[in-house]
Amino acid sequence: MTEPVSDQTALVLFSGGQDSATCLAWALSRFARVEMIGFDYGQRHAVELDCRAKLLDGFRAISSEWASKLGDSHTLAIPTLSAISDTALTRDVEIAMGADGLPNTFVPGRNLIFLTFAAALAYRRGIADIVGGMCETDYSGYPDCRDDTIKALQGAISLGMARDFELHTPLMWRDKAATWQLAHDLGGAALVDLIREHSHTCYLGERGERHDWGYGCGECPACALRARGWREYRTRTG
């Protein structure tokens, strides 16, 4: 854990998943105060939203400094996103690859919408720094996770709201193994164990089966990425 490099408040996109939990720790190590926002858009794995409370309790237990920095946790319902999307994340259909090379778990515009709503909330609360877990190093190919997309959106929302926002993506160039390592660097074994036990990644919302990397079906693309990253992390660290 390090001293904050900023006396400002950050807003973290916090879904209850591995990546967003790691980003929350990253923000807590760098900002004086941190607020969170999560989105309920009719996702099949909405159980991840329920994981946030236990994760936050765990963060407070790991560090009294982190506990003192944790601010409001917001939840925003966006049912319209599910209504206009026809994907395996919002419909009870089998996960498969599409003809365009993208898995049918891709929700068009999801991160663009999330970040725009986050910026609108940040504007109202006087926050300029927004943190998201987007990554194009070890991911499913979603175009709204790419670095150039995030940079373009940062410019657009800054212009559109006449406010200089900064979109931080600390995982952008890290693979999943490096994301596990970052969690360890930030909060030690306690944070790694917290993320394993209480974060949620599985697209199917499965929490009945426990693996060494956490809970999930073990078969969907999200579980596969998380499991592979865990194995590589354990190999690298011995």
Swiss-Prot record:
Pathway: Purine metabolism; 7-cyano-7-deazaguanine biosynthesis
Cofactor(s) needed: Zn(2+)
Organism of origin: Rhodopseudomonas palustris (strain HaA2)
Domain of life, source organism: Bacteria
Cofactor: binding comment: Binds 1 zinc ion per subunit.
Keywords: ATP-binding, Ligase, Metal-binding, Nucleotide-binding, Queuosine biosynthesis, Zinc
Name of the top EC class for this enzyme: ligase
Gene (name only): queC1
Gene Ontology molecular function terms on file: ATP binding; ligase activity, forming carbon-nitrogen bonds; zinc ion binding
UniProt record, GO biological process: queuosine biosynthetic process
Reaction catalysis annotation: 7-carboxy-7-deazaguanine + NH4(+) + ATP = 7-cyano-7-deazaguanine + ADP + phosphate + H2O + H(+)
Positions contributing to Zn(2+) binding: C202, C217, C220, C223
Entry's family note: Belongs to the QueC family.
Name of this chain's protein: 7-cyano-7-deazaguanine synthase 1
Function: Catalyzes the ATP-dependent conversion of 7-carboxy-7-deazaguanine (CDG) to 7-cyano-7-deazaguanine (preQ(0)).
Annotated binding of ATP, by residue: F14, S15, G16, G17, Q18, D19, S20, A21, T22, C23, L24
UniProt keyword annotation of Nucleotide-binding present: yes
EC nos: 6.3.4.20
